[in-house]
A protein has these predicted regions:
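Beta1/beta-strand and adjacent pyrophosphate-binding region of the FAD-binding site
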Residues: 3-17
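A generic local secondary-structure boundary/capping motif
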Residues: 23, 141-143, 282-286
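Short hydrophobic core segments
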Residues: 12, 145-156
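Conserved N-terminal/central alpha/beta ligand/cofactor-binding core
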Residues: 5, 23-127, 131, 142, ...
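C-terminal catalytic lobe of FAD-dependent flavoproteins
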Residues: 258-296
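Short, flexible hinge/linker loops that cap or flank conserved catalytic cores
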Residues: 2-3, 145
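Short, hydrophobic/aromatic-rich segments at coil-to-beta transitions
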Residues: 132-137
Length: 296
């Protein structure tokens, strides 16, 4: 039997935005396809495995109010919940949940696989053309051809992605994952301008190497909080986070390493994120701070 690769909507990229876009389109009753380079990395939590935070928590709950998946999946994968900014008025409170990143990805994939009108295809889009009948034709790296009335691009960091680890530069969308160079090329040929944005990813630490007796516990809230109005109870056991403060010895190590930092050796033309700076940025921006905190 010949596979029908004709859809009303095709979503390219299965990160958080792509998952919500594909789910929303399918629930509207249109034939939808979600194309991703790796089905095992759907809704991958690449950075800090958390949902919410100041301002972002309100957005996550608005997505839930509009019928999205993020809130329900977060509640299913949450291992610690906190309501931030409680020292301010209720309008400033912001929910945040630390999540099991593997559980989050698997739960999102399962929800999408059980959504009517939605199919998932693992491949890389290499070419997009618009025919005279206003139908888009997509070709993939592995030779498949798709047709769609509408295309939603949610490629995130994969469009001509470049990763920096110290002085080393490697093409890719995430560690050990290739960037989408072909798609970027054809978007530029279609007249779209490309630019480069920056994000940073914290290191992963083996918990077996941490002396927790020297750290301060950072516990979550014991009463049940949730992101989705649909969720009824916590699913996973709640875990502790930890805080630690740096000292003069650590600061000296960081200063010696500044020539290897892409933000400070000219490799990256950016000032970095405002509210989530790297530890070396804290050192440079706030030199008078003797013990800035770190969170594990």
């Amino acid at each position: 039997m010949k596979e029908d690769f004709t859809y009303d909507v095709i979503v390219i990229g299965a990160g958080h935005a792509g998952c919500e876009a594909a789910h929303a389109a399918a629930r509207m009753g249109v034939r939808t396809c979600l194309i991703t380079m790796d089905m095992n990395k759907i809704a991958q939590m690449s950075c800090n495995p958390a949902i919410g935070g100041i301002a972002k928590g309100q957005i996550a709950r608005e997505v839930d109010a509009l019928g999205g998946l993020m809130g329900e999946v977060t509640d299913a994968a949450s291992v610690q919940f906190k309501m931030l900014n409680r020292s301010k008025g209720p309008a400033m409170w912001s929910p945040r949940a630390q999540c099991d990143r593997v559980k989050y990805s698997l739960t999102m994939r399962r929800r999408l696989e059980n959504t009517p009108n939605l199919q998932i295809w693992q491949d890389e889009v290499s070419r997009i053309e618009k025919r005279n009948d206003n139908i888009f034709e997509l070709r993939t790296l592995w030779g498949a051809t798709f047709q769609a009335k509408c295309i939603v691009l949610t490629a995130g960091t994969f469009l001509n992605g470049l990763m920096h680890v110290g002085r080393q530069k490697v093409e890719g969308g995430r560690c050990a994952e290739p960037s989408s160079k072909f798609l970027t090329k054809y978007l530029e040929m279609a007249g779209l301008k490309s630019a480069r944005m920056k994000t940073g990813t914290p290191v992963r630490i083996d918990s077996r190497s941490v002396h927790f007796e020297n750290l301060k516990e950072d516990v979550g809230e014991v009463d049940f909080h949730r992101f989705s109005f649909v969720s009824e109870q916590r699913v996973l056991p709640q875990m502790k986070c930890w805080t630690v403060q740096t000292n003069a010895e650590v600061h000296e190590v960081l200063r010696r390493g500044l020539p290897d930092s892409p933000l400070y050796n000219g490799q990256i033309q950016s000032i970095g994120p405002r509210y989530c700076p790297s530890i070396e940025t804290k050192l440079v921006t706030f030199p008078d701070r003797e013990q800035p905190p770190l969170f594990l």
